[in-house]
């Protein structure tokens, strides 16, 4: 059986259809496609060679030899169709060999075509353009002209067998040379790429070495700073069992100050009373303030006995001085109110809060005296405050009622030392009455305590008018408002109009020792506590 191949070449789209047995193969190339299908037939019919896709079949002495495996055809690469039987009956008439001139012309044409021929791309899905042959018979490709391609080429191919054999040898040599040239070009390109890679590696190594050297220079060990032995090391404070004991040894006078100056802050009780003292000690507090009742309500909240027991135990275990606990009263309290209903509410609420202090074992309770509301005079309102204190002290035990000075905002009482003096003077049991000085309130009320000299004068006046024996607490606040503005606006220590001299004066004056000094600033309190303790001076070095 002889294969019958129909070539349909479309010049516009440059497509080739091969109809071979049951398979239709469509090939698309970006340029001219040169395909080769050779057919050799001798008169003895000893050898029949079929080239189909990737297979070359031989028929010799009624034996089929398959040179390559075929994965695409179902028939195992055997070409079998009825149309091919008709071709077997035709006779092939060999032509005389061509002359030398014709051979030279053909070679020149082939060389010109080879220059125009693009590089062949491998198509794994179909078959490679270069046809593989057996060792016995090597068949060279036949380059057909696309413009003159038609069905007549099949008959001319059968007639020009000798012509093919002569031309195939020349084309084989040319193809081998082309392949060698392509291999040489590929080798040269590979060598160039290797050289470029080496250069790039050298560059990267140089850059890495430079970066490592620069990084090494940057990572050089820093020079150690020389420490002066005379430098003040007070900034390092230990907050363990020995509170505020410094790493360096101090004189006895400074140690006494560190032990007797009681600084703390106003904290929340949202985490409960049992853990309150532990938390404030961890922040370096030696004094503390809190609300025993919500500050903006008339409702009464009673401290639980279990909480009070744990609170007392924590105070004893941590050696926390109970006299330095100064709870704050509700903002609704107005013991000088001209309104009888509100006056009674205020008295009942303060009684309840002072009883909470009794349950906790606390000995002092701080409150704002109230206001006259422009309905009565200041002196009349001060008398009502004193009467309210007598009423409350008769119904409570042991707890001292501590009157806080005010900024004089609105119609508030207590913005002068004389107001405080008159209230105390009218109270029957003076042992249970005390005073709390707020630095911001004093400054806003007109007491300019921004300098040390002014502090000397003002606190001497306080001692004459009221007396330090009634001083039970101090609120440490800087002021956002100016002196005499009568605006109660707290600021962090050293950041307001008062400045640090006043607070340095307070922590170094013995008259303020063992008195709770409470911060009511925005915080954080632990940093401000350290700052205030750093203001303590050594009297022996003066």
UniProtKB/Swiss-Prot annotation:
Biased composition (Acidic residues): 179-196
Enzyme kind, highest EC tier: hydrolase
Protein's UniProt name: Endonuclease 4 homolog
Coiled-coil annotated spans: 171-206
Record flagged with keyword Ribosomal protein: no
Regions of compositional bias (Basic residues) in chain numbering: 216-227
Cellular component annotations (GO), alphabetically ordered: mitochondrion; nucleus
The EC number(s) this enzyme carries: 3.1.21.2
Species the sequence originates in: Dictyostelium discoideum (Social amoeba)
Entry keyword Lipid biosynthesis: no
Domain notes: The C-terminal part is sufficient to function as an AP endonuclease.
Disordered as annotated region, ranges: 89-123, 141-234
Lineage: Eukaryota, Amoebozoa, Evosea, Eumycetozoa, Dictyostelia
Residues binding Zn(2+) 3, per UniProt: 441, 488, 490
Entry note: cofactor: Binds 3 Zn(2+) ions.
Annotated function: Plays a role in DNA repair. It cleaves phosphodiester bonds at apurinic or apyrimidinic sites (AP sites) to produce new 5'-ends that are base-free deoxyribose 5-phosphate residues.
Signal peptide span: none
Cofactor(s) named in the record: Zn(2+)
């Amino acid at each position: 059986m002889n294969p019958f191949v129909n070539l349909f070449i479309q010049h516009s789209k440059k497509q080739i259809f091969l109809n071979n047995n049951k398979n239709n193969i469509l090939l698309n190339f970006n340029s001219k496609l040169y395909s080769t299908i050779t057919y050799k037939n001798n008169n003895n019919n000893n050898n029949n060679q079929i080239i189909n896709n990737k297979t070359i079949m031989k028929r010799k002495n009624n034996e089929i030899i398959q040179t390559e495996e075929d994965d695409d055809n179902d028939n195992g690469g055997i070409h079998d169709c009825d149309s091919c039987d008709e071709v077997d009956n035709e006779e092939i008439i060999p032509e005389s060999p061509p002359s030398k001139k014709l051979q030279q012309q053909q070679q020149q044409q082939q060389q010109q075509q080879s220059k125009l021929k693009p590089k062949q791309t491998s198509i794994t899905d179909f078959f490679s353009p270069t046809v593989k042959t057996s060792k016995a018979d090597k068949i060279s490709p036949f380059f057909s002209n696309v413009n003159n391609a038609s069905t007549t080429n099949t008959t001319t191919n059968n007639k020009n067998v000798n012509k093919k054999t002569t031309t195939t040898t020349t084309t084989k040599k040319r193809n081998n040379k082309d392949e060698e040239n392509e291999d040489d070009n590929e080798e040269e390109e590979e060598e160039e790429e290797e050289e470029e890679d080496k250069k790039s590696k050298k560059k990267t190594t140089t850059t890495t070495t430079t970066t490592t050297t620069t990084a090494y220079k940057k990572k050089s060990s820093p020079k150690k700073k020389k420490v002066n032995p005379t430098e003040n090391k007070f900034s390092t404070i230990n907050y363990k069992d020995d509170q505020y004991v410094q790493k360096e040894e101090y004189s006895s006078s400074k140690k006494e100050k560190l032990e007797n100056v009681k600084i703390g802050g106003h904290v929340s009780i949202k985490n409960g009373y049992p853990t309150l003292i532990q938390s404030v000690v961890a922040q370096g507090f030696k004094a503390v303030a809190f609300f025993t009742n919500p500050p903006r309500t008339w409702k009464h909240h009673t401290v639980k006995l279990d909480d009070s027991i744990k609170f007392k135990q924590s105070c004893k275990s941590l050696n926390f001085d109970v006299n330095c606990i100064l709870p704050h009263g509700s903002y609704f309290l107005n013991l000088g109110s001209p309104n009888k209903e509100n006056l009674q509410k205020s008295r009942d609420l303060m009684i309840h809060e002072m009883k909470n202090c009794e349950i906790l074992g606390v000995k002092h309770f701080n409150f704002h005296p109230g206001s006259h509301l422009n309905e009565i005079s200041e002196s009349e309102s001060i008398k009502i405050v004193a009467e309210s204190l007598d009423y409350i002290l008769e119904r409570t035990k042991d707890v001292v009622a501590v009157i806080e000075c005010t900024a004089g905002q609105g119609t508030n009482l207590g913005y002068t030392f004389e107001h405080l003096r008159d209230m105390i003077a009218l109270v029957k049991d003076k042992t249970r009455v005390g005073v709390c000085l707020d630095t911001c309130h004093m400054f806003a009320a007109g007491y300019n305590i921004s300098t040390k000299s002014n502090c000397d004068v003002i606190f001497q006046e306080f001692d004459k008018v009221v007396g330090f024996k009634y001083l039970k607490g101090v609120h440490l606040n800087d002021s956002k408002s100016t002196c005499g503005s009568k605006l109660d606006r707290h600021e962090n220590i050293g950041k307001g109009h008062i400045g640090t001299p006043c607070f340095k004066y307070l922590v170094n004056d013995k008259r303020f020792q063992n008195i709770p000094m409470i911060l009511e600033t925005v915080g954080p309190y632990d940093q401000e506590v350290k700052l205030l303790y750093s203001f303590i001076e050594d009297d022996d070095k003066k």
